[in-house]
Amino acid sequence: MLKFYKMGIKRLSGEMTMGEERMDLGIEFETTEEIPVPERLIDQVIGQDHAVEVIKTAAKQRRHVLLIGEPGTGKSMLGQAMAELLPTEDLEDILVFPNPEDENMPRIKTVPAGQGRRIVEEYKRKAKEQENIRFYLLFFVFFIVAMAVFMSRGDPNTLLLGVFVILIALMVTANMRFRTQAMVPKLLVDNSGRKRAPFVDATGAHAGALLGDVRHDPFQCFSGEETVVIRENGEVKVLRLKDFVEKALEKPSGEGLDGDVKVVYHDFRNENVEVLTKDGFTKLLYANKRIGKQKLRRVVNLEKDYWFALTPDHKVYTTDGLKEAGEITEKDELISVPITVFDCEDEDLKKIGLLPLTSDDERLRKIATLMGILFNGGSIDEGLGVLTLKSERSVIEKFVITLKELFGKFEYEIIKEENTILKTRDPRIIKFLVGLGAPIEGKDLKMPWWVKLKPSLFLAFLEGFRAHIVEQLVDDPNKNLPFFQELSWYLGLFGIKADIKVEEVGDKHKIIFDAGRLDVDKQFIETWEDVEVTYNLTTEKGNLLANGLFVKNSGGLGTPAHLRVEPGMIHRAHKGVLFIDEIATLSLKMQQSLLTAMQEKKFPITGQSELSSGAMVRTEPVPCDFILVAAGNLDTIEKMHPALRSRIRGYGYEVYMRTTMPDTVENRRKLVQFVAQEVKKDGRIPHFTRDAVEEIIREAQRRAGRKGHLTLRLRDLGGVVRAAGDIAVRKGKKYVTREDVLEALQMAKPLEKQLADWYIERKKEYQVIRTEGGEIGRVNGLAIIGEQSGIVLPIEAIVAPAASKEEGKIIVTGKLGEIAREAVLNVSAIIKRYKGEDISRYDIHVQFLQTYEGVEGDSASISVATAVISALEEIPVRQDVAMTGSLSVRGEVLPVGGVTPKIEAAIEAGIKKVIIPKANEKDVFLSPDKREKIEIIPVERIDEVLEVALVESEKKKELIKRIRETLPLGVSESAGSETLHEHGRDSGSALSVEESKA
């Protein structure tokens, strides 16, 4: 037996030694600079010869293709290569036109590539000509009216008639302008100047992006600080927009995406909620909150007395018609609608003309100044009986004078202490000021909503507040802090930055508000603000009043239907390639729609999401004659829509992507080309020397996991190329050398490899992995994490009297998968055969130590068998030996996958010997330094495993003799080798990591 081991090691070492000699790469070169890189992508595909031929045929015959295989094998590259092979002469532009007969069914027209732009430009030119005609017509009307007024010598009737004619002319020309703009078509798909057919990657696309969508009129949003008037179930409330929307979104109706911005909305269509607009209240449809990077244009026009903070595309009503907020200038006059600020049933206040008080009342500025004074030094008591103001004498006198102007004579008293104090108990004054939002003792400070209607009112409030530095000592800063934050935001509209600090003073808090200068020296102030959140409301009439300004909202749909149509990826891929990776992740509904598009070669565009304008807009069928290149893994086939797969299979090809290719000179030459391609594609790393390329090819041999093969998981291999290039750049080298590649292999370890190293280090530290001595029932198994990372997997077994008198059980713990559990049961057949006695008297417990994330596969079979036999026979197992291999019920050791990374894990754990299946002998690729650290023992039968693994003793010799006598051994060397999968892994031999959470 000892002689057999030595021969095996010699053969294995001899093969690896040959690998160290200068490798035949099929081409002579010093660096990859000398290697020509093909121009066409199809010629850059490495190792997938069958797939390449299929793609060439499919491109010529316009067939669909389904590519199935593991990640990183070139599926996307083949899709792009197909696009290069398609002719460009057949490319078309697609335009969408308005439909005069039905505006909700825009018309579709296709023209040869390049003509679409010319058609749109021609329509724009005609629209501009009509705009000039409009201007000349207006000029002519003004001239005629002016002449008529002049000839009539100022006759009032003529003047009135002239004004009427001018208004009619303005209305007619405005409508003409809208109609001419609405007639300009939209270019949906522009293929002008294309030198190759379209390639569209639709991986992970949502329904609107894949199939096309009819977008909402641009979401026109507010800052949220604006005031709106809401009527809910008959009760009228004045609320800050932000507060209203946030409360509604406590119960959201849904959410979606508008580009990179998340939209959350509440549906009010079935609720009795209305919003005030120019002509009274209108039904509220939706309240929306948009989360994401956005810009607000903030404008203050002191001359025209308005301000706003809106997204640039928000439409505002001006005296010249609708304008976007981004286009408003200082000359524009915005339409402001008077709002009732305060009204109640009080005869005394009505007698002196203070009720009803509207936003256009001239006295409101004086009242705002009173409020500012009161907010800085006064309040009304909780019982609403006394108004108290503590301030300077001059301020008190100004306050009293203004009150007398509004209310006439009233009773008050002034107390002179450290500060002058004014007190009044006049019920008219108190009721009036409370109704307008005056500060009340014990309640939170809130800026009066009507002060925010106009900049003139805010400045009047600020004049009364007057102090640019305020310090307040309070018990709870959260009560007054929002007031100062809101004040700071409105000061920001004027370009004034205010600082707010909260300091602890004993058991109280001091709020410090510092606004610096409060001077405003410009009449028109414009600022831009980057925000993360905006708000808007959608109403039935498409408009509302915000801070008294008449503005449009997102429900108006003022943009013509055809301009809101957005093409889907299926339309942009017309006459080209539509690539979808992981196609099974598409919903069945989307797969069904994709099937329809493939069959009909046309697909109408309609609303696909909550954020579209809905299904009322539906275009004529839009051409989408694409070639589908779908991709996925093996489980993709099960999850695909059966009809979609049938369509591809019936009208195209299904291709399985190879994961390895034979290790021939020709294929090595292809890998040399691959390295040169990766360097050229990256553009930031130097070329590789011949030695460096050899090391890359050795890594390809190792990663193949099969004797005489090279890996085709070239994305991962490309990662090694780039990592080595980065190292060479860091060192300032002209070329990448072998040392750089070796360093890259250490530095750019996969996550699984890093976890495996950490796992081994930790288990050794806590002595979970043992590498010395012998123990009964304990074996060091080997497993795989991910694709290429090995790990030592301790397995323990004990034998106990059966809990049931009827039968014994094999009890396995360690979160085993189905294949692993069945493999353990197979071990019992061998035990029963050699034991020669009824083992139903025993319960056999097998534990895979600390495998929290589970174990799958049958590569631990010989480890389990060894542990159980050791426990039954009470023979210790050597702890400096690790093993991997599948086991048949006849006692044959069958091949498994990943033997190289498993052996590397054993080396790192400090193990001296490793047992592997004989069939995997030539699958081992180790560097010379690693090979010196371990003895590799290939075996074919379970008795050979026990010969190596068990500690020498008389019981061991008797056991092995019994096994050889009872088991049907003596199989050929190649037995079972066909069970090794092409991708180098046993049937599920994998460990999805343990301890990642520990």
From Swiss-Prot:
The name this protein goes by in its record: Archaeal Lon protease
Record-annotated disulphide pairs: none
Membrane topology note: Multi-pass membrane protein
Organism classification: Archaea, Methanobacteriati, Methanobacteriota, Thermococci, Thermococcales
GO biological-process terms attached to the record: intein-mediated protein splicing; intron homing; protein catabolic process; regulation of DNA-templated transcription
Alphabetized UniProt keyword annotations: ATP-binding, Autocatalytic cleavage, Cell membrane, Endonuclease, Hydrolase, Intron homing, Membrane, Nuclease, Nucleotide-binding, Protease, Protein splicing, Serine protease, Transmembrane, Transmembrane helix
Residues covered by region (Disordered): 971-998
Pfam (any one): Mg_chelatase
EC number: 3.4.21.-
Topology, Extracellular side: 153-155
UniProt source species: Pyrococcus abyssi (strain GE5 / Orsay)
Subcellular location as annotated: Cell membrane
Family annotation (Gene3D superfamilies): 1.10.8.60, 3.30.230.10, Hedgehog/Intein (Hint) domain, P-loop containing nucleotide triphosphate hydrolases
SMART domains: HintN
Domain Lon proteolytic: 773-952
GO MF annotation terms: ATP binding; ATP-dependent peptidase activity; endonuclease activity; serine-type endopeptidase activity
